[in-house]
Each structure stands twice: as C-alpha cells, then as structure tokens.
Amino acid sequence: MQRRMCVKKNLDMTEGTPISLLWAFTFPTLMGNLLNQVYSITDSIVVGRYLGQTALAAVGSTMPVILLLAALMIGINVGVGIIISRYFGQKNEELMRRAFVNSLYLGLFLSAGMMVMGLTFSGTILRWMGTPEGPLQEATAYLEISFITMICPLMYYLFSSAFRGLGDSQTALYCLIVSVLSNIGLDVLFVAVFRWGVAGSAWATALAQALSAVVAAVLLFRKYPMMRMRRQDLRLHGKLLRQITVLAIPIAVQSAFNNLGNLVAQSAVNLFGEATMAAYTAASRIGTLALMPVETIGSSLSVYASQNHGAGKPQRIRQGVRASLQLSLVVSTVLGVFLLLCGRQMAGLFLAEPSAEILTVVQRFLLITAVPGILAGVMQVYQQVLRGVDRANQALMGGVMQLITKIAVVAVGAWGMRNLDVVWLGWPASFVAGTVIPYFCFQKIAREIETE
C-alpha cells in the first residue's frame, strides 16, 4: 500500500503522450532554473551597483573556474538521477536507496579533493587566465570561499537529483525557491547592508545552499518513505558505485569540457580589459535565459528516456526526441525574440552608470550567442537522449567536438583577429559541432534498441 502511495506522487513517463509528459516534467524544473537565473542576475546587479565595475568583473571571472572544478559533482548528480529513474521504472526501491547513498559517498570524497585543489591553486589559475590586477584580489577571495563551502552545493544538488530521478520536479522547485529567496535576502544583507564586499556574496550563496539542502533532505524522507535509509543501505556497494561512475565520468568530463571552453572564453575576454569583463559577466547572465531552458528540456528527456529504457519501451524514446525538439523550437524562439528586443535595457540594470561600450558589448553577445538558441536545443536533445539509454560515451564524443570548435573559434577571434564578434561566434559554431556525432549515433542506436 505504501509503495503505491509513494509511486502515485511521481510522474511515470512510461505511459501517456510524450510531449505532455515532457512538458509536465520540464515546466517546474524550467521555472526553477529561470528562478535560479533570476537570482544569478540579481546577485550580479547587487554586486555591480553596490560594489562597482571592478567587483562585477571579479565575480564574473571566477565562474568558469568554479564550474570547471564542480564538473565532477555535476556528473554524479546527473548520474544518480538517471539511475534512480531507471530503478523507479523497474519499481526496485532497495536499489534506489542504495544508489543514492553510494552517490553521497562518492560526492563527499570528490568534493573534499576539489576543495583542497581550489584552495591551493585559486590565485594561480586566475593569474594564468590573465585576470587584471584590479579585480584579482577580490576574485581570489570569492573563489577560495566557494571551495571552502563546496559541500553545500554538493548536498543540495544530490537531493534535487533524487527528486528528479523519482519524477518529482515540483518538490525540487520548492527547494530551489527556498535557495533563491534566501540567497537574494542574504546577498542584499551581506553586500548592501553589512558591506562585506565580494566575500559577502560568496558566503550568502553557500549559506542559502546549505539551508536548501536541509529542506530538501527533510522533504525527501518525509514525502518518500521508500527513500529512508536502512542500516544495510549504508554499506558501500561496488556494483552501484561502478554504475554511477560509468555514467558520471563521461557526463563530468563533458561538463568539464564545456566549462573549459568557458574558461578559455573568459581568458579571451580578459584580453579586452575590465570594462569588457564586466560586460561579459552581465551578458552571460542574461544570455543564459535563452540557453538554459533548452538545456532543461534536454535534461528532462534523459530522465524520460531512462524510465522508458528501464521499462523496456524503446519505441517511446524516439517519440520523446521529436517532442523535445518541438518544445525546444517554441521556447528558444520566444526567448530569442525577447532578448533581441530587451537585452540592451536589461544590461543597464547591472551598473549604476553603464558606459556605451558595455551596453554595446552585451547587445552584440546576445545577438550572436543567445538568439540562435535552437541550435543549442537540438544539441542538448541528442546528447541527453544518449545518456538516458546508457550511451554517455557517445554523447561525450559530441562534447569533445563542441569543446574543440569553441576553443578554436574563440582563439582565432581573441588572439588572432582581436575581434569580439568572432569570439562570440564560438558559441553557435560549437552547438552545431556538438550535434553531429550524437545525431548519427542516436539514429543507429535507436534502430538497435527497437529491435532488441
């Protein structure tokens, strides 16, 4: 009886119309990610308006580094979500619990290693990236605090991944609302009221994520008694660790590749000076509004594909791909038009007196990278569906091509031609390059699994 009650609360994507199921699952996650992006934009506005252009450039320069070193956590989070969704499709509650526990062990071990690495090499990495002396000290402080508190986002994202693996993106949204609202409140308090500077912004983020992790843990174990750990669940499970690792490593490496591309892009932007760095920080925050929704649709497709793969319904996977492409086209078109019309006005919010140079850089970045968001949507669909059917290595091959293309175009634009527009072309070019291999791999794999 308890099992039926628990399962009924989830979204079972093995039955029903694919486009309706994907939208029902994507919408709460999409709203949550948009809300999270609203926080990111608000954080940059608070830093830019109260601390100035140098502080905004400092915070922006650290983001590729933080995301690069956090790539292993991202891989674990996505991997555990896919595995939990697979065992949910099989109705195997014991393995769902054990997979979650073992992901916690793996994540804790890796986060400790990343914390030590980040504390040791933060200043060196920022100097290697060519960060100007003006924002360097504040950037180093922000980066070091982020790694000291790495355990906070780790725990929060692992619990959120468990909700998503169970098909419950709505509760994950509630936890995100707690994180975003507390983050904005603490950000204003620490930066605008207490005047703790860039360090205050870093501590605000960590404390908000810690609070959200606690809320997520309470909700997970209260709402889903089947996820409450028994003593036997606490043992290390070699087979599950291997499954998580096999999924996590390609995803983590691809995430690292993506962020390595962003790190190279940040290094390229640093060549153009502090004003361009501040403009890029604002532009990348705004541009994510167009790119993040299609990433969310792709992520939802991986859960959909995993559930149907686990349930032995391969014919529904191809239907899910078509539905995801349709959703991506609609969402990316609407948001692309919005940013084209309103991007320059949004950029004016980040600094008290933004220069014409900053506003122009933001506008050109959005026109070239965010407006053609459908290219990113197609790439995400084909990469994510491969992950959902246990073909993460093929998705990784697409990620490698994406990275190589982005770095090559950015390098030509920055170090060869000294032309920012060419640097920005690295984004759409990489989306196209990252699609080719996953597309043809999926066509081949789809035929294979449909005849199994």
Q: What kind of feature is each model-predicted range?
A:
Residues 1-26, 84-151, 193-249, 305-372, ...:
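Short alpha-helical transmembrane segments in multi-pass integral membrane proteins
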Residues 29, 33, 45, 49, ...:
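Transmembrane alpha-helix boundary and packing residues in multipass membrane permease domains
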Residues 56-116, 153-172, 279-343, 376-398:
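Small-residue-rich hydrophobic transmembrane alpha-helices
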